[in-house]
């Protein structure tokens, strides 16, 4: 019996040990028996691992009898192939989100278990991994694919209770946390939008309710004023009609405002609302009457509109009588006769106003014509002044020019200068002429300063005769303040008149001659240099040719 006793030896870390061994064998490329190629790069693997993880590789390797076959994978990137190899050898892989779709597609084509529908192993749901490591060293934004059955069971997929795991993928993968966050944000935004829309709708409804209540209050106020007016409304309307009927003058306006105030005061005990309305209408009519009366009663029309004003006053008296006759009727209620009379009088007032305006315009035109005629007449009647009349002063004017022409040069020399006679007079005359030249220079400067401003312009150029300006200032302030002028070894300072550009009067002819002489000299020197250069270049050749001949 002791020989039949058996002992069960269990390796607790069997799977992890095998996985680690396969990983080390793959890294060291030990005992590899096949090669996978993608994008010109190669990965060596073990047939056993490939057959265990993919039915596609299992059938493919069964038909191959070579010791070391090479499989070229089309439409698969090397990075995706490397990730699938890590997944098959270790059971998990870390990959970025943008590469997840391409990896799943390649796994579907190669029928990798756990990544495709045609698998016999457990399904895997992509789960974000906060702490993990892989061969590439990418830690952030990575997803872990684990070969477990718990994720599929959690998603609601029906799994067989028996040990058979050769079913197709059941259920759907759980969404990622980012998608859940996006959905939560969208739901919060929708709730916020709904709350905002509800608030806006409530505000709009409140505003419409307020508008409706305001309109109802206004209508009720109008109804109450109309009901409470009674006979006082007739008096107020009568007062307003009479206010519009009478002509627009300042005295009539004051009278009518007083009458409107009296009617409003009498109607106040009847109803306060009608009285206030009548007073407001009276004030409005008063303002309109004042503006129109100010526009009509101008200074140009006052003297010529007296006759028309008298006629208007006569019409006013007639209208006042008619209103006095119709007064009792208006107090009791509306009178059709008074209404027709007011309409007729309104037409009369309009006609009178039109006539007054026409008269004012015609008078203004006449005044303009009179002014033009008077101006023409004044231009025609212009006469020379008495100071220009030669006939009036012929008797008192003495002609001295004839006497100076008759006098000889000797007499002029004797008479010129001071009152002293003899030799001293001639000496003083010479000095007087020298001083006279200086005085002429000063007078010319003063005349330039006091010149008529009409002749002064920024574009004018003044040339002072017989002077040469050697110092020219670029700043206009210094140019206007001081300019140095040299003449006959004498320096004289004058100020330039008003904004004028003082330019010297030079002897341009001499300067042009000197310039032309200089240019001709330079030209001949240049030609001489060219001639010498040509001789130096050509003369040796000529001598050589002559010697050779």
From Swiss-Prot:
Localization in the cell: Nucleus
Tissue expr: Mostly neuronal.
Keywords: Developmental protein, Differentiation, Neurogenesis, Nucleus, Transcription, Transcription regulation
UniProt main location, coarse: nucleus
Gene Ontology CC: one annotated term: nucleoplasm
Record's keyword annotation contains Ribonucleoprotein: no
Compositionally biased intervals (Low complexity): 162-175, 228-251, 263-293, 329-340
Region called Disordered, residue ranges: 115-200, 228-340
SUPFAM superfamilies associated with the record: POZ domain
GO biological process, one term: larval lymph gland hemopoiesis
Matches recorded under CDD domains: BTB_POZ_BAB-like
InterPro entries, A to Z: BTB/POZ_dom, Dros_DevTransReg, SKP1/BTB/POZ_sf
Molecular function (Gene Ontology), one example: DNA-binding transcription factor activity
UniProt keyword Transcription regulation present: yes
Residues in BTB domain copies: 32-97
PANTHER family named among the record's database cross-references: BTB DOMAIN TRANSCRIPTION FACTOR (PTHR23110), LONGITUDINALS LACKING PROTEIN, ISOFORMS F_I_K_T (PTHR23110:SF111)
Function: Putative transcription factor required for axon growth and guidance in the central and peripheral nervous systems. Repels CNS axons away from the midline by promoting the expression of the midline repellent sli and its receptor robo.
Protein name per Swiss-Prot or TrEMBL: Longitudinals lacking protein, isoforms H/M/V
Organism whose genome encodes this protein: Drosophila melanogaster
Gene: lola
